[in-house]
């Protein structure tokens, strides 16, 4: 795979990777871009990490220190921070490995719908049939060769 293709890809692994620093540091880790707070707010709100009416608490949330283990955060919050990092990179392709395993189903659907609206190509590995319903195409690994084209819903 050429280096130029990899420059267009953001990956969210199944096992989340965090760095020592603030939540903002973790979201912007690996990017040279500085996202304005309003863009960060939109991403975090869409991922259910902050509420629309959080006001000044938003900046306190961004400045909150966390460690690489994500102490004080739930597994779902850690996973959503990693998704926020991928979205903040503004890549053409996002690859997500079981991105919603630690997230409730309704929020997971909302998150995948948001990702699809903001990224041209989304590749997801999942065992969740509700997430598969959102796909334009999916590959059934059990049959080992069957590519199934679906009708991705515009939500």
Predicted regions and their residues:
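Conserved post-Walker A/P-loop segment of ABC ATPase nucleotide-binding domains
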Residues: 1-3, 33-34, 144
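ABC ATPase nucleotide-binding domain helical subdomain, centered on the C-loop/LSGGQ "ABC signature"
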Residues: 24-68, 109-113
């Amino acid at each position: 795979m050429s280096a130029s293709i990899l420059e267009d890809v953001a990956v969210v692994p199944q096992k989340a990777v965090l760095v020592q620093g603030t939540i903002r540091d973790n979201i912007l880790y690996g990017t040279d871009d500085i996202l304005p707070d309003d863009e960060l707010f939109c991403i975090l709100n869409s991922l259910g990490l902050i509420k629309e009416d959080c006001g000044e608490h938003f900046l306190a949330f961004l400045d909150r220190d966390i460690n690489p283990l994500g102490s004080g955060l739930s597994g779902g919050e850690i996973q959503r921070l990693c998704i926020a990092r991928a979205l903040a990179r503004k890549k053409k392709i996002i690859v997500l490995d079981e991105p919603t395993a630690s997230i409730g189903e309704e929020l997971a659907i909302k998150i995948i719908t948001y990702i699809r609206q903001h990224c041209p190509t989304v590749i997801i590995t999942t065992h969740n049939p509700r997430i598969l319903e959102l796909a334009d195409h999916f590959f059934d690994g059990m049959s080992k060769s069957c590519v199934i084209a679906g009708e991705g819903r515009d939500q």
